[in-house]
């Protein structure tokens, strides 16, 4: 069994091949593909999650509500929908880092993170992140955490969808929510990557 998570290039090549076949067979059109991409890039997905994270970084009362009941707190910002009925947000600290996985399939909080990345659905990721999280984070995602940081893995399911509230980067005091949201990445809300470094 191959335990190596496919590279983004390998995944992209597979997707492109499948897309070409479906277009050639008139199952879908390029306009349909473009529209679906636009929906998940602009109307659903990581940009919305980044908006929630930035709000939590700047509003302690909202952050408390988010950590208490993420589903309801997200609704305050107009964010809800399929695959986001029961969400729990996990706060990263200096001592504890969280990462999410669905060991059974690919359950994922779509309203805030969009479509799951292909690697998230791969059996290798689903098995290895549970057994050897520090190794997977460093070798597969080039994300190196201090040895003193405890890594907790959360198994998301159809009943409960977890996602991560990453730590606010230093040097962002006085930044607007819009500026802060630009630093938040999808991978930081999954727990497999950092937020962007402030410029």
Curated annotation (Swiss-Prot):
Residues annotated with Cysteine sulfenic acid (-SOH) modification: 107
Record PTM Cysteine sulfinic acid (-SO2H), positions in chain: 105
Keyword Flavoprotein listed: no
Cofactor: Fe(3+)
Family assignment from sequence similarity: Belongs to the nitrile hydratase subunit alpha family.
Official protein name in the record: Nitrile hydratase subunit alpha
Database matches in InterPro entries: CN_Hdrase_a/SCN_Hdrase_g_sf, CN_Hdrtase_a/SCN_Hdrlase_g, CN_Hdrtase_asu/SCN_Hdrlase_gsu, Nitrile_hydratase_asu
UniProt PTM: Oxidation on Cys-105 is essential for the activity. Oxidation on Cys-107 stabilizes the Fe-NO ligand coordinated in the inactive form.
Catalytic activity annotation: an aliphatic primary amide = an aliphatic nitrile + H2O
Keywords for the protein's UniProt record, in alphabetical order: Iron, Lyase, Metal-binding, Oxidation
Source species of the chain: Rhodococcus sp
Disulfide cross-links: none
Cofactor note: Binds 1 Fe(3+) ion per subunit.
Activity regulation text: Inactivated by oxidation of Cys-107 to a sulfenic acid.
EC number per UniProt: 4.2.1.84
Enzyme class, spelled out: lyase
GO molecular function terms attached to this record: nitrile hydratase activity; transition metal ion binding
Residues given in the record as Fe(3+) binding sites: 102, 105-107
Subunit field text: Heterodimer of an alpha and a beta chain.
Function: NHase catalyzes the hydration of various nitrile compounds to the corresponding amides. Industrial production of acrylamide is now being developed using some of the enzymes of this class.
